[in-house]
Design a protein with these regions (language model features):
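Inter-motif core of Ras-like GTPase G domains
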Residues: 97-120
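Anionic group-transfer/hydrolysis microenvironments
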Residues: 4, 89-90, 120, 149, ...
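Short internal beta-strands
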Residues: 2, 114-117, 142-148
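N-terminal phosphate/diphosphate-binding loop that engages ATP/GTP or pyrophosphate donors
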Residues: 1-61, 73
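C-terminal lobe/tail of nucleotide-utilizing enzymes
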Residues: 131-187
């Protein structure tokens, strides 16, 4: 699920299908009905901005406690044999409200994180900064996934090695641009 999404275009079926929410539903074999969209992404905003800014443009805001409660309920409803992924929005320091960031949301949920990063120029700094920020809140990092960007200045393996050298024992997996995830990909 992706509880918060900005850049949402409710009136365009193609845009819905191409959105993160549409892609998540399609990957589960779920039709993008109003009910399915509400269940996956209840906090939707039109402007492609940080959620706090996008919500403000619509005269709205995100109720942080409601967001956390929604996610906790979904975790509770997930069976023992199921896996629930809660996709964030932007980076860990993206503002959700006037006082809360994605980092606060992650910390409040207390769930381990699968940090997905690109392989673009600057990703090493962004990744190390995100991990350091998570450490300040004692957030468990399950693994880092490097999703190969369209333009990677160096091979993803070099990026992974550099990140690993600075973080120590981090689990890092690489997903190549062609989408062929490693057969042994386990988190």
């Amino acid at each position: 699920m992706k509880p918060v999404i900005s850049g949402w275009d409710q009136g365009d079926a193609e845009a819905i299908a191409a959105s993160d929410t549409g892609q998540l539903l399609a990957a589960q074999g779920i039709e993008a009905t109003v009910e399915a969209i509400d269940a996956c992404s209840p906090f939707r905003f039109k402007a492609p901005l940080s959620p706090d800014m996008a919500a403000a443009r619509e005269g709205l805001g995100i109720d942080f406690d409601r967001l956390v409660g929604f996610c906790r309920q979904e975790v509770e409803n997930t069976g023992d044999e199921e896996t629930l992924f809660i996709e964030g929005v932007g980076g860990v320091m993206v503002p959700l409200t006037e006082r809360h960031t994605v980092l606060d949301w992650i910390a409040e949920l207390g769930l381990p994180v699968l940090l997905v990063v690109g392989s673009y120029l600057g990703t090493i700094s962004h990744t190390l900064t995100a991990v350091m920020a998570m450490r300040t809140k004692h957030i468990a990092l399950r693994a880092i996934v490097i999703s190969e960007s369209e333009e990677s200045p160096v091979p993803c393996e070099e990026t992974a090695e550099t990140i690993k050298r600075h973080l120590g024992s981090a689990t890092i997996e690489i997903v190549p641009r062609d989408g062929a995830a490693p057969a042994a990909f386990r988190i």
